[in-house]
Amino acid sequence: MQTQVLFEHPLNEKMRTWLRIEFLIQQLTVNLPIVDHAGALHFFRNVSELLDVFERGEVRTELLKELDRQQRKLQTWIGVPGVDQSRIEALIQQLKAAGSVLISAPRIGQFLREDRLIALVRQRLSIPGGCCSFDLPTLHIWLHLPQAQRDSQVETWIASLNPLTQALTMVLDLIRQSAPFRKQTSLNGFYQDNGGDADLLRLNLSLDSQLYPQISGHKSRFAIRFMPLDSENGQVPERLNFELACC
């Protein structure tokens, strides 16, 4: 049984966007294969939200900058005694390859944006009950196509995101691994510290405490307030131990 809960909190806008994209891409595959209306709406709603996120910022530009930054960080370890040089070289080559694929790919989300079925469903998602069969006969008949035909189309849609997914996964993995967890203690439910130009906070908290963190701040300074899940009867101990990584 799980005894700890991992919380992550972005300390800047680019990280906030990346975590949202990662979450939405993960949600695309949760209910696959699509076998009914509920599964279809879950899928198309996440596709729609992904496209909304893509339209708000320069996702590709920020990712390419980060891929380059991670390469420069790794290059500082070349020739350092005790460091696995083959591993460093392999990571640098993987980052370069991910960048090349991303920069040559079509506009992120364009393939999904131009799909007729996705466009029709997106138009109805904001309307309460707007995806009934009489509102969306196209979706209704799509759900009655052979399963293999639907699966193939869904795989094609998801594959169109592969250049983004590959680059984002590499970047987030390297950022998450960039700092170890350290034991910390809050006093009366409060903890604050300097971020040291971190992009991401990762916090491990015992499930037994039934507390959750409210985090505020930015890359240079942050504060954590621990709150009880039971807002009426829950209590926050005077001293609370937890693990924190500033990545």
Swiss-Prot record:
Protein name: Cell division protein ZapD
Keywords per UniProt: Cell cycle, Cell division, Cytoplasm, Septation
Function: Cell division factor that enhances FtsZ-ring assembly. Directly interacts with FtsZ and promotes bundling of FtsZ protofilaments, with a reduction in FtsZ GTPase activity.
Complexes and interactors: Interacts with FtsZ.
UniProt lineage: Bacteria, Pseudomonadati, Pseudomonadota, Gammaproteobacteria, Enterobacterales
Gene Ontology biological process terms from the UniProt entry: division septum assembly; FtsZ-dependent cytokinesis
Pfam families in the record: ZapD (PF07072)
Keyword Protease belongs to the record: no
Record keyword Electron transport present: no
Similarity annotation: Belongs to the ZapD family.
Source species of the chain: Shigella boydii serotype 4 (strain Sb227)
InterPro entries reported for this sequence: ZapD, ZapD_C, ZapD_sf
GO cellular component assignments: cell division site; cytoplasm
Cellular localisation: Cytoplasm
Top-level taxon in the UniProt lineage: Bacteria
Gene3D superfamilies: YacF-like, YacF-like domains
